[in-house]
Amino acid sequence: MLRYILRKMISKKWLFIALLIGNILLTGIAASNPLYADAVMQRMLTDDMDAYLTKKNAYPGLVSVFFNGSVKKNGLIKENEALAHAVPADFGVPARMEVRRYFMSPIQNQPLIERDDAKISSIGLGALEDVAAHARIVAGRMFDGERRADGTVEVIVSQRALVELNLLMGERREFPKLTDADGQPIVIEVVGVYDVSDVEDPYWVRSPSSYKSECLLDFDLFNRLFVREDLPVALSGCWYELLDAEQMSARNAQALYETALKYQEMGKNRQYLTVTVAFSDILKNHISQARRVRVTLW
């Protein structure tokens, strides 16, 4: 039998060579198909992320952790900050940037120099970490990171806040019910008006105009003055974790989606906490599409 097969192979050697080459090519295609499929899946996920950015003008890798505080819950803000810090490690994706924001409920205040046109409205005080590196001062100057010798705290406002709150450059306002640790009323002075320095900067999850009722002061100074349990005003925090969307692997789409669901469920089960994962629906749709595409490729 073996001799018969050998004679056939010799007599029809070109046919057998063609079959051998065909088998080699078929094996190569079968071996490379998973790599090709992975590349297609990754391209699909990247395109979906780009489409989200174009359609919503918002960064697709964003995870927002929002703590809506109350006077009795002010001491929990650091606990929730630790939860936000764990987001990149839990998703297994490095963060391009983390933006920390602290703010308090609007508070009654009064101008130190009376104005005929003064509108006495409640004003919120807040802080954005590293805002000086991402903002452009359009009038006045950036705040100082320390209190003045007389206790005054320097703040900046958005152009909309300047109008909505009827504030003036150089104006000083006192907050009788908001005191420092020594019991002294907080006094602020508006020293600058800010806007974005780069419209494509992902740092500005919220545009300056959205801070229409809030004055911003130095982040570290805000921490020293107001991040304490005995603060007589509700203290809230928001942490924006901007995960690197380009490093999200399509191979891990299912695991990423399950982690997103875990965080969203955490926000539902914890009082005062809200968690939003911008790319959750992107991953959900990608997983569904990927199943159909893989069937086609195979």
Task: List each model region and its residues.
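Membrane transport/envelope proteins' first extracytoplasmic loop
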Residues: 2-298
